[in-house]
Amino acid sequence: SMGESECEGRDRMMRLYNFAKENIPGFENAAMLGAAEQMGIRQTRMLQGEYVVTKDDVKSRRHFETSVCRGRDYYTPYGALLPKAIDNLIVAGRHYSVESDAQKMSREIPPCQAQGEAAGIAVALALNSDQALREVDYKAIQKQMRAQGADPGDEPSANALCENNIAAE
């Protein structure tokens, strides 16, 4: 249960704190100022989207033509924001469509913010053109992201894995 997990977490924290005070030079006078009131959940259920980003996609820096935002060196295709079985819903941040191991590598705050920006643009475009979210042209999202000063990942970095350099391998 959450309560048991929180107790175990606090117990581990105190053991580490005491170990550091007793065994690591410079920590003798350390003081614990506090800890989080509640345990944070980093990962739960994963969305099944039109595309599921894989660990290999993130590690290999796979570029997608339909990319609507970019992390450090990885790209998020528009389909990873669109749930497979639900129309007119878009998801951004740590809940986008991604494998568990890939999510651990790609849930940083800046790309989550960029996904949110892309999702907001997609919704605005859908509303303004009376379209379903699946019908929104990813190129229009990319164009608006660029106009707002964001990197939609439409231009692959020099170290990106692109379809044209996959064929060359």
PLM regions: where:
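Short, surface-exposed, polar/charged, turn-prone segments marking secondary-structure boundaries
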Residues: 59-62, 117-121, 163
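Non-catalytic terminal regions with compositionally biased, polar/charged low complexity
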Residues: 127-169
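Structural signal for hydrophobic packing residues in well-ordered secondary-structure cores
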Residues: 17-24, 123, 127, 149
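Short, conserved micro-motifs enriched in small and acidic residues
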Residues: 3, 7, 106-114
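Mobile, glycine/GP-rich and aromatic-enriched active-site lid/loop segments adjacent to catalytic centers
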Residues: 1-102
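Internal hydrophobic alpha-helix adjacent to the cofactor/substrate pocket in enzyme cavities
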Residues: 113-130
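Composition- and surface-driven signal marking solvent-exposed, interaction-prone regions
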Residues: 2, 102-107, 130-138
